[in-house]
Amino acid sequence: MSRIGIFYGSSSGVTGKVAEKLAELLGEERCDLYNMEEDFVDFDDMLKYDHLLFGCSTWGSGEVQNDWRDPLLELDNEKPDFSGKTIALFGAGDYVSHGEQFVSALGVLYDKFKARGAALVGSFPTDGYTYEYSFAVRDGKFVGLPFDKINEVDKTDERLERWIAVLQEEFLPA
């Protein structure tokens, strides 16, 4: 059974908790968790997996979470090849305080890793979300799973279960 690498940045712990929940739902025995601040060394950590989940919250006016900033600069400079890798994205946002850039960091990750050859899967419907704008919306869907653990905590578990069903079809290795 092929392993899944789950890489996440989490300033307040929210994205980390969702990463742990995803590992539980996908089967902890097949998942390796990497906190970008504590565990990430270089892209070889990611490239050893064919299937990856990246978790990143959005801060301020659409910026990626701090732990992703340097690795994304390195991605641009080193240009590692992610061809043959399948990536799904998830991330926290706050539609009340930052509805003008709701989970836009996912759009940044999407563009960066797509440009490096990765196949990105796991898009999620925008239905049921309230926001003004999101850079993470492409072709009418979010590029990954957005969640708002501040204003919509009651919807997170149901959305996770729906996203797992999407991943069962598009992502999960045999």
UniProtKB/Swiss-Prot annotation:
Q: Which NCBIfam families match?
A: flav_long, PRK09267.1-5
Please tell me whether the keyword Nucleus is annotated for this protein.
no
Identify the domain of life: Bacteria
Pfam families named among the record's database cross-references: Flavodoxin_1
Q: Which UniProt keywords apply?
A: Electron transport, Flavoprotein, FMN, Transport
Q: Which residues cross the membrane?
A: none
Give the organism the record lists: Azotobacter vinelandii (strain DJ / ATCC BAA-1303)
Q: Which SUPFAM superfamilies match?
A: Flavoproteins (SSF52218)
Report the residue ranges that make up the Flavodoxin-like domain in this protein. 4-168
What taxonomic ancestry is recorded?
Bacteria, Pseudomonadati, Pseudomonadota, Gammaproteobacteria, Pseudomonadales
Q: What is this protein called in UniProt?
A: Flavodoxin 1
Q: Where is the signal peptide?
A: none
